[in-house]
Amino acid sequence: MKSNTSQYIPYNCISANLLENYEYPESPFFRGTGFFVYFPPFDDYIFYVSAKHCFCGYKENNFLEKLKIPYQYKTEENFNNSLDEAVIFSEYLTMKHNEEDDDFEDLIVFVVDKNIKKEKKLLLKTRALRLEHQDNIDKILKNLCNIEGNIRTVGFPQVSKEIDFDTKQARIQPRGFYGKIAIKENDINRYKFKQPSWKEGEYNGFSGSPILEIISFYNSNYEIVMEAIPIGILLSATKH
């Protein structure tokens, strides 16, 4: 990602969605991206967020056991180990824009089991992005739209993922891009990239990636700190 803010991109928050194959359990496959978040002051809860359409074809009660996300951020993994040592999720959440809507949002939130070992929870906490309150996110988005500011994303497109079934090795590389934000007309809470920097073909695999804004603030030592804040999720993209 060519940008002077690339040093602040939190690569370790993301994971490629590794899914167990119904018909061939020993041949898992990748579909989309997801990322870990937490929401102060409820620090006991850690969530994994992705696009719901990444799980099409799976019965809803099988989501939890078929998704295999490693506790540690890795770009190379023996997927036999990943299937055995995967994050345990206790439930998942789906949502609507309001109760009167017939359709659910293309969004799914997995809840990390609170009973996992302390060291594993701490490991996930270091990977998780801090969620802001919605009022703050709305202000950030409004300001970005007014100034046509840049937004960023990072994920695992298909061009950066490889599975070798002979050696049972999975290799993935995170990729990112940025572009100017614009409101998507006639859609509630939908935005789009203008002039995206992605030049490597299709966007397949980016679904579920976090949309990021880099903000600065003063810490307790009155030092300026830069932090990547999730302000949305990438649901779809088309090469023009």
Locate the predicted segments by residue:
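Beta-rich catalytic cores
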Residues: F30, D106, S207
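Terminal peptide-recognition signature
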Residues: G34, S50, F110, E148, ...
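Acidic, polar low-complexity intrinsically disordered regions
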Residues: I69-D102, V109-F110, K117-I137
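Short glycine/Trp-rich loop-beta-loop segment that forms part of the substrate-binding cleft
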Residues: A128-R171
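Catalytic nucleophile loop of clan PA
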Residues: S197-I233
